[in-house]
């Protein structure tokens, strides 16, 4: 069996170029399902293809496990970065994401269906896609690196953050303990040089308003993953009880705690273990879909 290949893709959706990275099972094997991964702030789809460490790549591991994996450059990143007016509104971003997935997949088989993975700021788009009318057709959703309440230390640091300024202490929130990550990752290999303007508003409205407003509308299984060394969000039992209660419309809400991981759970030394747990959940959702 040859190692999976990751290919860049570019499609046009409503006049906006949308870029992505794609990995597929070796032909002629049809995919078990399609996993669409959405990165967080300050990075790109490269987040899901850890540079220099193919064993830590969600894209490569997913294809090897029998899934088609599409890692989107979130609207406002990658090829869509020069089109701020086309990504300013949440509904625009949802339509662009769904449109990009449809164009990338085309007539190719989708197996049991499409499953969404969101990390950090990417959870906002994934949640909006899940709460959309089209979300009822999804297999399920994986959320990681997000929450309902900021950790007290993070709250003070993030207050000073802006598109132009990275406040002191931000690196420690996102990348510590440093020994959790390969050295190459810590040099900024996955960092995006730009960020869309709409993210400034998201940082102030997501936890307080958007998350609790969207969660009840999600009607598919949800898994919520917490890194052992998460420093941005409150992850204690009380916080998780509150979050679970928000997902009143989902048939299943599961919490997964990933040992040995920091906030950037798909780039650390334990990323392969984390990704394997995601694939297991996707398989469970696919089996439930097939069983009717």
Q: PLM features: residue spans?
A:
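N-terminal cap/lid segment of alpha/beta-hydrolase-fold proteins
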Residues: 1-28
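Conserved loop-alpha-helix segment in the C-terminal half of the alpha/beta-hydrolase fold
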Residues: 228-261
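Conserved alpha/beta-hydrolase
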Residues: 55-81
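Short, surface-exposed "cap/lid" segments of acyl-processing enzymes
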Residues: 29-64
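Catalytic active-site module of serine/aspartate enzymes centered on a nucleophile-bearing elbow/loop
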Residues: 252-292
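Short beta-strand/loop motif that positions the catalytic acidic residue
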Residues: 218, 224-226
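Conserved acidic catalytic loop of the alpha/beta-hydrolase fold
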Residues: 94-112
